[in-house]
């Protein structure tokens, strides 16, 4: 078993990604949670890949050109390679080579960065302006807050440190408006509430603060 296989279960508990393929099952997570729970968060372009004979299905090793690091300076100040399972059924991630810039999140294990389908991985040009601003500073400000998922009504916050995440209840589904345009940030008095960045107001979001 590869080190990555041992990480799959852990990663699927906290990170954002795509709904599972076959045996790969991922719980939805707000981008802020994915940011705060990741060892590494970077913007990078994939410039190469190779299949390493490791484990039952092998491991894909992507060579990347790191553009910017948002989180993880103390763990790995510069990332040159990322590792993922070769099989999508084991949450392996497929990335285009020499085509797009990506936002990549992942864990560090034995000096290597691992990522997969259950991590928050997205093409950079698909991120909203609010998400980009979140990566630069807003998400970091909210790492002491807790985003509470709401899958069905009624649901309530039970602590002043919680923000209620209701994207899963909307007609647009997940990822929704709160994922794309809001960060959960501590306000005066120690309360956490949704903070809207550069996005049109959505009156359905409660306890939101304008810039």
Curated annotation (Swiss-Prot):
CDD domains assigned: NTR_TIMP
Keywords recorded for this protein, A-Z: Disulfide bond, Extracellular matrix, Metal-binding, Metalloenzyme inhibitor, Metalloprotease inhibitor, Protease inhibitor, Secreted, Signal, Zinc
Any one Gene Ontology cellular component term annotated for this protein: extracellular matrix
Domain of life of the native organism: Eukaryota
Gene3D superfamilies the record matches: 2.40.50.120, Tissue inhibitor of metalloproteinase-1. Chain B, domain 1 (3.90.370.10)
Cystine connections: 24-91, 26-118, 36-143, 145-192, 150-155, 163-184
Signal sequence segment: 1-23
Segments for region (Involved in metalloproteinase-binding): 24-27, 88-89
Function of the molecule: Mediates a variety of processes including matrix regulation and turnover, inflammation, and angiogenesis, through reversible inhibition of zinc protease superfamily enzymes, primarily matrix metalloproteinases (MMPs). Regulates extracellular matrix (ECM) remodeling through inhibition of matrix metalloproteinases (MMP) including MMP-1, MMP-2, MMP-3, MMP-7, MMP-9, MMP-13, MMP-14 and MMP-15. Additionally, modulates the processing of amyloid precursor protein (APP) and apolipoprotein E receptor ApoER2 by inhibiting two alpha-secretases ADAM10 and ADAM17.
Subunit-structure text: Interacts with EFEMP1. Interacts with KDR.
Protein name: Metalloproteinase inhibitor 3
């Amino acid at each position: 078993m590869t080190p990555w296989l041992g990480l799959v279960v852990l990663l699927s508990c906290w990170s954002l990604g795509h709904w599972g393929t076959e045996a790969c099952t991922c719980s939805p997570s707000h981008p802020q949670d994915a940011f705060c729970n990741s060892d590494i968060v970077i913007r990078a372009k994939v410039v190469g890949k190779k299949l390493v004979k490791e484990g039952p299905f092998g491991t894909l090793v992507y060579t990347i050109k790191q553009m910017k690091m948002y989180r993880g300076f103390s763990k790995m100040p510069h990332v040159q390679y990322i590792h993922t399972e070769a099989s999508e059924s084991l949450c392996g991630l497929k990335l285009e080579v020499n085509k797009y810039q990506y936002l990549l999140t992942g864990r560090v294990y034995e000096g290597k960065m691992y990522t997969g389908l259950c991590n928050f991985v997205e093409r950079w040009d698909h991120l909203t302006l609010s998400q980009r601003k979140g990566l630069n500073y807003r998400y970091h400000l909210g790492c002491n807050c807790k985003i509470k998922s709401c899958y069905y009504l009624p649901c309530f916050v039970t602590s002043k440190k919680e923000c209620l995440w209701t994207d899963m209840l909307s007609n647009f589904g997940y990822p929704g408006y709160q994922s794309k345009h809001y960060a959960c940030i501590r306000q005066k008095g120690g309360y956490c509430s949704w903070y809207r960045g550069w996005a049109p107001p959505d009156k359905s979001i409660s306890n939101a603060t304008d810039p």
